[in-house]
Amino acid sequence: MNRYILIPEDTIRVLPPEDGAEAAIEIFCSRTVIYFEIAQVRDVCLMHNVLSNRRRVDALCFTAADRLLEREQMVLVPTDRADYAAFLTDFRTYAPETLDFSKEEDYIPESCDHNGHHHG
């Protein structure tokens, strides 16, 4: 599973349901756009001690398969982003009732970057 921590240059927003399509999360990172169907989000929690922009912050973490490749991804959205509050409000609006937004965990970085380097 890929992990992705949003950087300040990325944008994230919730697209409401429209023309038969379900609500989705849209992420612009660099020149790439990634979509996640909100109904397909498998898990959500608040992660503590995520390294973002050279600081430790909390981040909302969600796990879901992206719409294009249908590969499961773990996405971390730092809570100190200017667009975080609006994103969280919209995400909760369209999230399935089964998602538990009260869960919290400590972030454990990967020990391998999949390029032959091992950390920790």
Language model regions located:
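Acidic, Ser/Thr- and proline-rich intrinsically disordered linker/docking segments
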Residues: D43-G120
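A generic structural signal for ordered secondary structure
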Residues: T11-R13, A24, V41, D58, ...
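Glycine-centered tight beta-turn/hairpin loop motif at sheet-sheet or coil-to-beta transitions
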Residues: I7-E9, C29-R31, R67-R71
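Phosphoinositide-binding peripheral membrane targeting modules
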Residues: P17-V50
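Short polybasic amphipathic segments
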Residues: R3, A23-I27, A59-T63
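Anionic N-terminal interaction surfaces
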Residues: M1-E22, A86, T93, I108-D113
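Short, flexible active-site loop motifs that bind/organize anionic cofactors or intermediates
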Residues: N2, R31, M74
